[in-house]
Amino acid sequence: LEFRRVLFRSIGIDLGTSAVKLLLMEESGKICNIVSREYPLFFPHPGWSEQKPEDWFAQSMEGMKELTKDIDRAQVAGIGFGGQMHGLVTLDKDDNVIRPAILWNDGRTGEETEYLNTVIGKDKLSQYTANIAFAGFTAPKILWMQKNEPENFKKVVKIMLPKDYLAYRLSGSFCTDVSDASGMLLLDVKNRCWSKEMLEICGITEEQLPKLYESWEVVGTLKPEIAKELGFSENVKVVAGAGDNAAAAVGTGTVGDGQCNISLGTSGTVFISSKNFGVDENNALHSFCHADGSYHLMGCMLSAASCNKWWAEEILQTKDFAAEQAPIQKLGENHVFFLPYLMGERSPHNNPDARGVFFGMSMDSTRADMTQAVLEGVAFGLRDSLEVARNLGIKIERTKICGGGAKSPLWKKIIANVMNLKVDVLENEEGPSMGGAMLAAVGCGAYPDVETIGKKFAKVVDTVEPDPELVAKYEERY
């Protein structure tokens, strides 16, 4: 038996906004290799954001070859996904991509979002899908395409999400999972099925939409020509995978009831898993299906670590984040504030036109004060979402943290005190790619369910405790 254990490996593919990150995992949870490959983002007009699905596929294939170059490729048993949510990928009758994918952070659908929220109405949307319309969601993008690109819209035979395009190219299975589908505004989240009413509103049919699976379910095996190109067995199982946030939650063990995870990636999220389906009355948080078979609430900030990246790289012209943070000493006493709305905002303000602001500067404000304000501004933004969940009566005393921004000790300390939570730091912070590999392991039968593997793999190595004095200072500033 021990011999077999080494022979089982799964691959997690995290299809991100700036790069695809691939992770190779042994059954024990040991990470054997990680590879990242970038692809371009296109901004054809202000506020638009697009990518070419072919780029995702090409870089994922190259990435898998690189990832497995030093192992016996016959050991690869399963492939799972985490991926950027909400993006609209459309294929024609010959399976060609009709137009570049319109991404989650694309802001062109203001009118369509407004139409859904006012003409159809938030109450109806919430009743059909447990959510209201956000500019980033998929349904408004479909309406936009219908109105602005009718020729393209007529050609649409398949509508899918970004990671589902990879699953389709690898396995030939036209599928999605319920966690990712929750962000389309086409899913009846409570009952985990497509909403007939929403399809009608968007002028599409169920045939154009992928078959729904739970995240760990096997959707197919590798196409023979793909297996051959990669040097993998044709029996490699492809599982449905999950949206990036649900996949990251699996990767960090945020499964089961009342668990919390904060992700500091390009966007920032507060993710709370719950056995019970629930919706807050103002729809300030997303209410989605979770990858473990249950539900979750999620607040999403459109700019989180990207605020810090923009501040350091664009404005200060440096990539040395640690050096910029080093002089910051006094927490809770900063007179400079930053509103982190560089791309508009989702939770809980839902305003695509919101913009970033620095205020409170005086002649003695320093570079470090402004850097600190950026870090604090993001933490305050995340707290907005936490407060909504607390008002729903969900008890949250600690949170896990992951994402690029979580590498900064200072930022973790700020978050612990702004949110008054114990912040658990995990041994590995691989998030969605790890979650994808774990879902594949469950799909291949190596583990009985997602909760088991989630609890087993998430190892807390450090906890940042809030300091009551700082908590009080930040409370005042919040």
Walk through the language-model features, giving the residues of each.
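Gly/Ser/Thr-rich active-site cleft segment
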Residues: 17, 125-243, 308, 340-343, ...
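ATP-dependent carbohydrate kinase catalytic cores
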Residues: 137, 185-292, 303, 319, ...
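Phosphate/pyrophosphate-binding loops at sites that engage ATP/ADP/AMP, CoA/4′-phosphopantetheine
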Residues: 60-77, 149-153, 196-206, 228-230, ...
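Glycine/Thr-rich phosphate-binding loops that ligate phosphate moieties of nucleotide
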Residues: 8-36, 43, 77-118, 151, ...
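Active-site nucleophile and cofactor-binding loops and adjacent substrate-binding regions
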Residues: 29, 51-53, 77-83, 102-105, ...
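A polyampholytic, Gly/Pro-enriched intrinsically disordered region
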Residues: 56, 118-134, 231-233, 258-261, ...
